[in-house]
Structures are given as C-alpha cells and as structure tokens.
UniProtKB/Swiss-Prot annotation:
Residues annotated to bind NAD(+): G48, S49, H52, V198, D218, R223, V263, R268, H270, P300, L302, G337, T339
Protein name per the record: Glutathione-independent formaldehyde dehydrogenase
Catalytic activity: formaldehyde + NAD(+) + H2O = formate + NADH + 2 H(+); acetaldehyde + NAD(+) + H2O = acetate + NADH + 2 H(+); 2 formaldehyde + H2O = methanol + formate + H(+)
Positions contributing to Zn(2+) 1 binding: C47, H68, D170
Thermal activity profile: Thermostable up to 60 degrees Celsius.
Binding site for Zn(2+) 2: C98, C101, C104, C112
Cofactor(s) this protein requires: Zn(2+)
Similarity annotation: Belongs to the zinc-containing alcohol dehydrogenase family.
Cofactor binding comment, as recorded: Binds 2 Zn(2+) ions per subunit.
Native organism: Pseudomonas putida (Arthrobacter siderocapsulatus)
Activity regulation details: Inactivated by bipyridine and p-chloromercuribenzoate.
Length: 399
C-alpha cells in the first residue's frame, strides 16, 4: 500500500487536498521506530487551532499536512507494540507523547520533553510541535502507540457513535479540561467565552460536571442561536450592554463562580464598535471582571509566542495588555496550556457510550469528504455553527 492524500497548507487562506507520502515507521528526523502504528484514518476533524494557521496567524510553513483530531483503525504495527492489534479502532490524542519522560510520567502529556526538539510538547500537523505529519489524511503514523492510543472497546457500538467519539481527540477533553480547571462542580454558575466547538464542549462539560447554569458568550449571532438551542444561556457580546450587566440580568448578580476562555489570541472587542477590531486581551480581562473573588479561570483557548498578523508589536510575541492586578486583587487562579488529553479521554469515552453527553449534537458535527475539506475550512472560518468532521474513506458518511 503506497497511496495517501492529505490536506496541505499552501499559505494564508489556502488549503488543498494533495497526494502525500504514505507513512513510514520513522520519526520526523528519519530515525526508524518500532513503537508506532500506521492507522487507516476513520475520522479527522477541522479545528479552530488549524484555522489560526490557515489564516496566517502563526509561523506555519507552506507544505504542512494539517490535522490533529483523529480516530483510526490499526493496519500496521511495529515490533515493540504489545497492546494493540491489527483492526483495533482507536482514538488518537492530539498530544504526541513518549510516555517515558518526567512530564509524561506525571501525566502532563501536553508538554512531553522528548518528541519535539524545539520545545516541550508535540502534536500532529501543527506549527512548532515536532514536525509530526498531520492526520487530515487517509493514513497516519502514530508513535509510542501503546502509550498514546485509546482503544475503543466495542467496534460496532463505537461506529454507531463515531460522530461523538471523534471529538475525543481534542475538543471534548479540551473543553472538559477548561471546565475542570475552572473549578466547575455541582451547583456552579459558569461563564464560557466563545460559542465555537471548544466553547460548546466546555459548556457541555460544565453541564456534565453538575453546573447549575452555563452562560455562553460570543459575537456571532448564528453561534449564539445554536448555543441557546442546546440549552445554554447566552450573552451577546456585540451589544453595548456590558457583559457583567448581561450576567446580572440572568443570575441576579454580576459575577460567576467559574469562567472558561475558549477564544484565545484572536479575540475581538465587545460592543458595537469594539467588535469591529481585534483586541487579544479582551477575553482574559473580561473573565477577571466577571469571576467572583477566589474563583478559577480555565484557559484552553490558544495563545501563541509568535503571531505575524498581530495588531501590535507586543502581541506579535504574545505579550498582551492584561489587567493582572485585577486578577491578583481578586485572588483568582488561572490554568493555561495544552490539554493533557489522556487524563480525560477514557472517562469521556464512557460518558459518550453511556449517553451521558451528546457532544456531536452540541457542537454541530457535519460529516464531509476529504475532497470537501477546503470548503469546510472556508465555512468554518466564516463562523458557521458547525464542527466539520472529515471521513476520508467514506466509512460512515451514510451511517
């Protein structure tokens, strides 16, 4: 077997499905490995993090094969793989992790110390994350397979819920991580900034964790309408009514117990005029304002160290005008960084299989073909309330 196709980044605003190399049992530096498997990709999703690159807001190089949200079938394995068999259906955490370093042993798999020579942390198909080939493709190599992969135990039942299980690679654990690190528990009042897929996953996770009320804020009316239809309260950030007043109208007080930033560095201002302009510190500053004293703020939204398209010189190197003094005065706790998917994915798999969470409906999963990926990128960038899931082999599109 030698054919393969994938979604390739061709520069700002452009992706294309091209022929790419069939995966080999070797790492990005050409070293042969025996701890990996080759997957036939069953599903692979378009993520907001991919959009940051496609918009030209990172230093991603032309020719990068995109995609880090992957579910697949094991079709080849190295000699050192002991716990997986040919034919197994597996969920792939977006983190590439060795399982051997200090970070991995402490389950900080988002900052593995060995898989990326440039910095801590690796991922598939992402800028500065170790040059691991992306999974928006027909076939993919996964290293350290015994450690990284989550086997889906009942293939037939898993395929019945593949639209939900495909979210286990990233957005559901990422949203859940945001809710957990924000301290969400039974009876919590929660504000989630961002009604995209990660924000909705955070909102659904907060509900799973027992939150009394979840408010989702956004500028996009279609996404707000979708969030409302899923049973969440909403805050329309395009209005001139300040966020704390909208929260007070819902809760009777202007603050929440817990807050989640599911927007990240491409945030825009609030209000009729503010929404017209990018203002990368907006979300963090607003969360400090509306989170009660001693509250927690989870920050799964992506922030970068290099942003070529930033609004000013400071933001180009990830330096933002944050009112940290306000957070200090209110004794806030902040939690940032890449989600350690493996910390949560098995429990969330069970929640899906036992109908405790219907994440595909919440985030608006729409299945498309690999050839339709460029269209999916365009529509997602336009702000439609959908989560595009690519089915490269037409395995379940008609299911």
């Amino acid at each position: 077997m030698s054919g393969n196709r994938g979604v390739v980044y061709l520069g700002s605003g452009k992706v294309e499905v091209q022929k790419i190399d069939y995966p080999k049992m070797q790492d990005p530096r050409g070293k042969k490995i025996e701890h990996g498997v080759i997957l036939k990709v069953v599903s692979t999703n378009i993520c907001g993090s991919d959009q940051h690159m496609v918009r030209g807001r990172t230093t991603a190089q032309v020719g990068l094969v995109l995609g880090h949200e992957i579910t697949g079938e094991v079709i080849e394995k190295g000699r050192d793989v002991e716990n997986l068999q040919i034919g197994d259906l597996v969920s792939v955490p977006f983190n590439v992790a060795c399982g051997r370093c200090r970070s991995c042993k402490e389950m900080h798999t988002g900052v593995c110390l060995t898989v990326n020579p440039a910095r801590a942390g690796g991922a598939y198909g992402y800028v500065d994350m170790g040059d691991w080939t992306g999974g928006q493709a027909e076939y993919l190599l996964v290293p350290y397979a015994d450690f990284n992969l989550l086997k889906l135990p009942d293939r037939d039942k898993a395929m019945e819920k593949i639209r939900d299980l495909t979210c286990l690679s990233d957005i559901l654990p990422t949203g859940y991580h945001g809710a957990v690190t924000a301290g969400v528990g039974p009876g919590s009042t929660v504000y989630v900034a961002g009604a995209g897929p990660v924000g909705l996953a955070a909102a659904a996770s907060a509900r799973l964790l027992g939150a009394a009320v979840v408010i989702v804020g956004d500028l996009n009316p279609a996404r707000l309408a979708h969030a409302k239809a899923q049973g969440f309260e909403i805050a329309d950030l395009s209005l001139d009514t300040p966020l704390h007043e909208q929260i007070a109208a819902l809760l009777g007080e202007p603050e929440v117990d817990c807050a989640v930033d599911a927007v990240g560095f491409e945030a825009r201002g609030h209000g009729h005029e503010g929404a017209k302009h990018e203002a990368p510190a907006t979300v963090l500053n607003s969360l400090m304002q509306v989170t009660r004293v001693a509250g927690k703020i989870g920050i799964p939204g992506l922030y970068v160290t290099e942003d070529p398209g930033a609004v000013d010189a400071a933001a180009k190197i990830g330096s933002l005008s944050i009112r940290f003094g306000l957070g200090w005065a209110k004794s806030h706790s902040f939690h940032t960084g890449q989600t350690p998917v493996m910390k949560y994915n098995r429990a969330l798999m069970q929640a899906i299989m036992w109908d405790r969470i219907n994440i595909a409906e919440v985030v608006g999963v729409q299945v498309i073909s690999l050839d339709d990926a460029p269209r999916g990128y365009g529509e997602f960038d336009a702000g439609v309330p959908k989560k595009f899931v690519i089915d490269p082999h037409k395995t379940f599109s008609a299911a």
